[in-house]
Amino acid sequence: MKKTRTANLHHLYHEPLPENLKLTPKVEVDNVHQRQTTDVYEHALTITAWQQIYDQLHPGKFHGEFTEILLDDIQVFREYTGLALRQSCLVWPNSFWFGIPATRGEQGFIGSQCLGSAEIATRPGGTEFELSTPDDYTILGVVLSEDVITRQANFLHNPDRVLHMLRNQSALEVKEQHKAALWGFVQQALATFCENPENLHQPAVRKVLGDNLLMAMGAMLEEAQPMVTAESISHQSYRRLLSRAREYVLENMSEPVTVLDLCNQLHVSRRTLQNAFHAILGIGPNAWLKRIRLNAVRRELISPWSQSMTVKDAAMQWGFWHLGQFATDYQQLFSEKPSLTLHQRMREWG
């Protein structure tokens, strides 16, 4: 069936929402989800009631795994991504998200703040944020509606302090034993209810699970502190510079953005730009620009909402005028020919 709806594939939706629209996940029959994904665009669509846009930064065939359970005004999930990503995220309104990364392996970032073994990420719903994650990365997510926190404020000793922190901080330092306890609880809950999802249809089961989760969250948040970053000021500013660079590229899709354009727009020298990209990503700005544009073309080729009907249309839209070189670069990054990406979309959606 052909889709006629138009959508912006490269930006999140920021229009004011109707007052009566509630995006809190609905707990009905379908409240346990498990998915295996082979594409970052597909993976970005897996989390219920979120908006996300992912860019694949490292070459290879992507593999992702996602598991979630939905309670009454509570969402719990585990996300695994096999390749390094840059993520734009927007959680459902009137909620708070908590990201609990695995303690093993390379560290991820929320904005310019590093998420180490004693840190968690947090953002209010309806507020866009950016994550940078390395290869082979696992993170647990807990989303609590503001209604739940208000109704169950007794699980917090000092709710005003905690809520102020959640509204104004993107990363918190927590006790490692509390983080480990929450990690174990969430993992056990996901494993149990993925094996027996019908048990979550019982209101009593959902209530006990939700209350136990709130107690574990409360123990962690009561002793949490705003994160004091150990990363240098220069590295933090470099990360902010990269975020601004990406937004500029995607806001100016009518013409290919060059390194000179970035220098002029961001008011930095070519050397500063080079230093920022090499310090944070290990590649130069030219290579990065190409990867961001290749990801944009892939979204145009793979999305059922895309208006691009040929590889040439999508490539030219993002400034790839040498189609042979474009096809080579595309296959090197995604381990797939662009014609195959488009063919799969046309076969499925017409």
From Swiss-Prot:
SUPFAM superfamilies per record: Homeodomain-like
Domain of life: Bacteria
Ranges of the DNA-binding region feature: 260-281, 311-334
GO terms, biological process: ethanolamine catabolic process; regulation of DNA-templated transcription
Presence of keyword DNA-binding: yes
Protein name: HTH-type DNA-binding transcriptional activator EutR
Organism expressing this protein natively: Escherichia coli (strain K12)
InterPro entries: AraC_XylS_family_regulators (IPR050204), Homeodomain-like_sf (IPR009057), HTH_AraC (IPR018060), HTH_AraC-typ_CS (IPR018062)
Involved pathway(s): Amine and polyamine degradation; ethanolamine degradation
Recorded GO MF terms: cis-regulatory region sequence-specific DNA binding; DNA-binding transcription factor activity
